[in-house]
Design a protein with these regions (language model features):
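N-terminal signal peptide c-region/cleavage motif recognized by signal peptidases
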Residues: 13-15
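Central antiparallel beta-sheet cores of small beta-barrel/beta-sandwich binding domains
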Residues: 28-105
């Protein structure tokens, strides 16, 4: 009887594990230095996902280098408008505070949902770069 209950519980929990999305806190990793930079909180608003910086790694100044007038990085919206389609997130924009440029964005869960591959690009996806957030 206990085995039957355990089996049923595992069977019912399986779809929940597969339904994991991108909502939550993600640690950004600088693709040039390999070091953590910030934590981005991704949340859903309607049918889109947006991300804002909620904390910074030690030693990272809380100022947006490209923002005019100057703004703090914490609270800055850096990811907007992603929409989920077949387990992938597309159609969004990502802001690079270092350059002040906004790029098209897409994202996809990787490594069993433990990391998020975020790609910023201009025009077509091959003209861009990918960061892996943890």
């Amino acid at each position: 009887m206990n085995k039957l209950i355990l089996s049923a519980a595992l069977l019912l929990a399986a779809p929940l594990a597969l339904a994991q999305g991108i909502e939550g806190k993600w640690r950004t990793i600088d693709d040039e230095s390999g070091k953590p930079k910030a934590v981005v909180q991704i949340s859903q608003s309607g049918n889109t996902f947006n991300g804002r910086i909620v904390s910074l790694a030690e030693g990272v100044k809380n100022e947006c280098p490209a923002c005019q007038p100057a703004k703090p990085l914490i609270g800055l919206n850096v990811l907007t408008g992603l929409q989920e389609k077949d387990g992938k997130y597309e159609g969004g924009k990502i802001y690079d505070p270092k350059s002040g440029k906004t790029y098209s964005a897409k994202a996809e869960l990787a490594n069993g949902g433990k990391s998020l591959k975020v790609r910023g690009f201009m025009g077509v996806s091959v003209l861009g770069r990918t960061q892996t957030w943890q």
